[in-house]
């Protein structure tokens, strides 16, 4: 592979002086709102992407203006936990330094800002730093934000799992001081240590990691490059089942790319988590495809080299053998809405945030509501991988005041079906440069149609996992949804069916490049059959496989496109 011409990103990383590139020069140049092509790749490692308003692109072109460039910045918040004081800072930044005046909760349990002018980037990052937050490695070819189940019931076990997620995030951070020098004005140190895990080429591609606490699977653990499924005995964490090789991204029409769920490798002790995480990452660093970038994810490395060879090399580098995996039940991927009491007698309020967008609208002043709650809350805020928010650690005597604020600002009280509560969508248009169709802006209306069809057929009590993305990169994990809509062109989507409710089987394309009317007509027919033909307890995804609408995907490399 070394004799072949590498992907252009590999040369950019090698020549970047550990992710510095010419970012500082680009930041100093205010003649344009953009960075150079090479630096646009490097800034991802610092936590942000260059975008433009695609709604205005043609108009500005006619006016002979450059696109209306702005930046999307994603924070690193392992496990999605922040304090009320931090949230107040996050909120203030969105109101003063972004043009979107909103906060977007993501499908990876953190938040991001949209509409940041280049001139505001440094001030914004310094504001995050003052709040003890950062965006280091939130994007780029590195380990990204580590997810962890925010289970509000088993709080002791959650605390133990969260500690592991936080340790993973901290241990696998890049060591380069480029972020501190460029954005925080810290001095460059003489004789900087090279990256001990990443090297100067970092990873071949993005790397996503999650820690789950069964039976909940809200983090969609099998869709990650590396996942740790907590195993408890008598309520205490004893270790994890390790899974590796998941990932959602693919490319329309290219069968050599496909989504994939992770393989089960075996059980490891808690004390060995860092060893195994580093071993998996360094094997991917050394074995991953650096020639064909679309085949660079860990899932392809395992497929190309073989499971047994990959497992043996991981064990060799970790210096520990996998034990047989422990039996575990994988259950619901949704969040528990409303109040739930934890084992510590504290209460936790999960608030539904449609598509994760926190913004003040008529009748729903969500951003103001969370701000007012943060001013009085004594616990913490927990972002979920379903784009929702948990007001965690509320004393019984404080519940009424918190709930009053939530209801006043439209954070509670909305009619929420099981299907809407299990639905997520990516941002897509107008800011995402990869989007081929709408997602976030259209998704609430689409779910209205789904709710109406379920009501028509008397199946409103059935929760169905529905997800929509504007392109096949899969940010909202659509290929693990019972109903997945993936953008193909404006107003057109590929319809995927057949994933299971728990997230341990992928879906498969049922209809290609169809519009809303055909999508709804197809689902109308299937919902009618599901209402009358389903077995007791049978979920919609399993039903579509059983009656032969789509075939089960058991081996994505062979079955997803076949």
UniProtKB/Swiss-Prot annotation:
Pfam families hit by this protein: NIR_SIR, NIR_SIR_ferr
Protein EC: 1.8.1.2
GO biological process: cysteine biosynthetic process; hydrogen sulfide biosynthetic process; sulfate assimilation
Residues reported to bind [4Fe-4S] cluster: 426, 432, 471, 475
SUPFAM superfamilies hit by this protein: Nitrite and sulphite reductase 4Fe-4S domain-like, Nitrite/Sulfite reductase N-terminal domain-like
Pathway recorded for this protein: Sulfur metabolism; hydrogen sulfide biosynthesis; hydrogen sulfide from sulfite (NADPH route): step 1/1
Ranges that cross the membrane: none
Broadest EC class assigned to this enzyme: oxidoreductase
GO molecular function: 4 iron, 4 sulfur cluster binding; heme binding; metal ion binding; NADP binding; sulfite reductase (ferredoxin) activity; sulfite reductase (NADPH) activity
Extent of the signal sequence: none
Reactions catalysed, as given in the entry: hydrogen sulfide + 3 NADP(+) + 3 H2O = sulfite + 3 NADPH + 4 H(+)
Keywords: 4Fe-4S, Amino-acid biosynthesis, Cysteine biosynthesis, Heme, Iron, Iron-sulfur, Metal-binding, NADP, Oxidoreductase
Cofactor stoichiometry and binding remark: Binds 1 siroheme per subunit. Binds 1 [4Fe-4S] cluster per subunit.
Record NCBIfam families: CysI, PRK13504.1
Function: Component of the sulfite reductase complex that catalyzes the 6-electron reduction of sulfite to sulfide. This is one of several activities required for the biosynthesis of L-cysteine from sulfate.
Family statement: Belongs to the nitrite and sulfite reductase 4Fe-4S domain family.
Protein known as: Sulfite reductase [NADPH] hemoprotein beta-component
Phylogenetic placement of the source organism: Bacteria, Pseudomonadati, Pseudomonadota, Gammaproteobacteria, Alteromonadales
Gene that specifies this protein: cysI
